[in-house]
């Protein structure tokens, strides 16, 4: 199957340059790229779709280039932004670029035989650019009218846009030209907001290769949306990162398992490598037995394992199951730290402290009277076990590896006692 057929079946193609020519070109191996600007020290799930697109192309026999924007990251892309980006110091951007390189290596095979992926950093050519030569040789190929007409620029004109960000599309176009010259790269892929920058690149290559038969292409993926109108990739706690130190695998797993029934089939097509037939089967289950949430569990399993590995995925599933069944006592200390990293907590040194007082210290209740009433009514659980004896001390309670006590008050309010 031509990879374009699979991508279209999954809803992953938003726009392409000459689709017929691209389809024919993809019948044999080609080199393509996608760029990732280091705007933070980690990629987030907003980057996941284009990253997985590179992986899909590599699995189909094509050669992907992951371009880290060590140069363009110093400038800032106005696409999709309503205000000017904060410019970060060069050393910070380069450090972030190195971290992003490490993350990308988890998704692409850079050592494979036949079509190994390529890692590049545009600082290599943008960092040493000669301004006069650049304006003479590259800048003359861009008309001000067409640059102003690009959606990424036009949408910012009323609010104001600096020359720095205005010139971003020229630098991105130059990236495509350099990758075409260095590696024979014939296609750029990106999000739908990148269409203007991508076509600027194809136009530049065409103008710079008059008399040559250099055909290049562009493809964009759709904007990932949520049916409830909220922004994809954002939670109450902020962005969902691919770095496990910024978003734990458990929290990552929970993001996917909480997917709306209206979105889950789309996300299975976008973010997993399950076959179309497997996804159609899960889609039928969403229609007939939505309460089982099998599609959400499969989505969370596949994406968490893809990003964080089997062990982290199994750990996330175990924590989720423990919270659902009340089997907190079966968790390890590491699993408790991961699963309860953002609940109210308190350090307790005196193990002769009454559980009643520990409830106050972690913020579960505001007074001893409220603590006693909660316990006597059966609303307090320690490591999944209901506790009604108001005379219990911390020393008398079971602990998780002698380090933690997990308290639940009511159905969903969790607190963590850390024994020090």
Curated annotation (Swiss-Prot):
The lineage of its organism: Bacteria, Bacillati, Bacillota, Clostridia, Eubacteriales. Catalyzes the attachment of tyrosine to tRNA(Tyr) in a two-step reaction: tyrosine is first activated by ATP to form Tyr-AMP and then transferred to the acceptor end of tRNA(Tyr). A motif ('KMSKS' region) lies at residues 231-235. It comes from the Bacteria. The keyword Amino-acid biosynthesis does not apply. A motif ('HIGH' region) lies at residues 38-47. ATP binds at residue 234. Pfam families: SYY_C-terminal, tRNA-synt_1b. One of its GO terms (molecular function) is RNA binding. GO terms for cellular component: cytosol. It catalyses: tRNA(Tyr) + L-tyrosine + ATP = L-tyrosyl-tRNA(Tyr) + AMP + diphosphate + H(+). This is Tyrosine--tRNA ligase. GO terms for biological process: tyrosyl-tRNA aminoacylation.
């Amino acid at each position: 199957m031509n990879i374009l057929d699979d991508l279209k079946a999954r809803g992953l193609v938003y726009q392409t340059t000459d689709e017929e020519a691209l389809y024919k070109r993809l019948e044999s191996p080609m080199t393509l790229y996608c760029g990732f600007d280091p705007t933070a020290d980690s990629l987030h799930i907003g980057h996941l779709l284009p990253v997985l697109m590179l992986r899909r192309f590599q699995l189909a026999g094509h050669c992907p280039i992951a371009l880290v924007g060590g140069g363009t990251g110093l400038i800032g892309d106005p696409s999709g932004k309503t205000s000017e980006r904060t410019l970060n110091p060069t050393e910070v951007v380069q450090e972030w670029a190195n971290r992003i390189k490490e993350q990308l290596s988890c998704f692409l095979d850079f050592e494979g035989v036949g079509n190994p992926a390529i890692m590049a950093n545009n600082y290599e050519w943008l960092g040493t650019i000669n301004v006069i030569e650049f304006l003479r040789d590259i800048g003359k190929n861009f008309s001000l009218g067409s640059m102003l007409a690009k959606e990424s620029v036009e949408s910012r004109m009323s609010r104001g846009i600096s020359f720095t960000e205005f010139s971003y599309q020229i630098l991105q176009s130059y990236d495509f030209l350099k990758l075409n010259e260095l590696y024979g790269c014939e296609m750029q892929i990106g999000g739908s907001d990148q269409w203007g920058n991508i076509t600027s690149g194809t136009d530049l290559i065409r103008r710079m290769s008059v008399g040559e038969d250099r055909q290049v292409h562009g493809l964009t993926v759709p904007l990932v949306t949520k049916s409830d109108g909220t922004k994809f990739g954002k939670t109450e706690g902020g962005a969902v990162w691919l770095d496990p130190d910024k978003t734990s695998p458990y929290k990552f797993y929970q993001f996917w398992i909480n997917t709306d029934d209206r979105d889950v089939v789309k996300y299975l097509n976008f973010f997993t490598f399950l076959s179309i037939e497997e996804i159609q089967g899960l889609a039928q289950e969403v229609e007939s037995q939505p309460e089982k949430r099998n599609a959400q569990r499969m989505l969370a399993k596949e994406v968490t394992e893809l990003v964080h590995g089997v062990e982290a995925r199994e750990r996330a599933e175990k924590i989720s199951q423990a919270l659902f069944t009340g089997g907190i006592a079966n968790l390890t200390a590491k699993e408790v730290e991961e699963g309860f990293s953002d609940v109210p907590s308190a350090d307790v040194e005196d193990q002769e402290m009454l559980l009643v007082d520990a409830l106050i210290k972690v913020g579960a209740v505001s007074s001893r009277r409220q603590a006693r009433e909660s316990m006597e009514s059966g609303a307090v659980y320690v490591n999944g076990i209901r506790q009604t004896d108001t005379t219990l001390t911390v020393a008398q309670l079971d602990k998780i590896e002698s380090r933690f006590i997990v308290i639940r008050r009511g159905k969903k309010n969790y607190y963590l006692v850390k024994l020090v």
